[in-house]
Amino acid sequence: MTLAVKCPILGFEETKNMEFSTIDEVFVRLKSLDGKDFSFVLINPYLIRPDYEFDIPTYYQELLSLTPESNMKIFNIVAIAKSIEESTVNFLAPVVINLDNNTMAQVILDTVNYPDFFQADQIANYIKK
C-alpha cells in the first residue's frame, strides 16, 4: 500500500511517498518511493509493550484527518542489530498511519510528557525470559 507522507521521518524530509508492506506478524516495512533507495523496519509496539499509550497531538490529528472512528495503526521504528534482543525501538517518535486515507506521519512526542519513552530502547527490555 502506498502512503502519502504528511509529516516526514526525521532526517528524511524530502520523502513524500512510502510503500507499506508486512514482513511478518511482528514487523512491517516502510520503503521510500521517491527515487532514494532506503527503507525502515517498524514494529507493532503493543506486541512488546502492551502499556504503550500516548495522546496524538491535535496538529497530527488534523494533518492525518484522524477522527475517533478512523482506522489507524501505530508503529515504531526499529534499529536492527546483530540480535533481536540488541535491536532498539524508538518509542518517542511513533509512526501513525491513517488507513482510511493512506496517510502517515512520524509523531514527535515531548519527553516531558513521556519520560518513560526513549529513542533507542532495547527490545530485550520487553522480552520475557
Curated annotation (Swiss-Prot):
What Gene3D superfamilies has UniProt attached to this entry? BH3618-like
Domain of life of the native organism? Bacteria
SUPFAM superfamilies in UniProt: BH3618-like
Q: Which GO terms describe its biological process?
A: bacterial-type flagellum assembly; regulation of translation
Location, primary (coarse class): cytoplasm
Coiled-coil parts of chain: none
Q: Please describe the quaternary structure of this protein.
A: Interacts with translational regulator CsrA and flagellin(s).
Name it: Flagellar assembly factor FliW
Gene label:
fliW
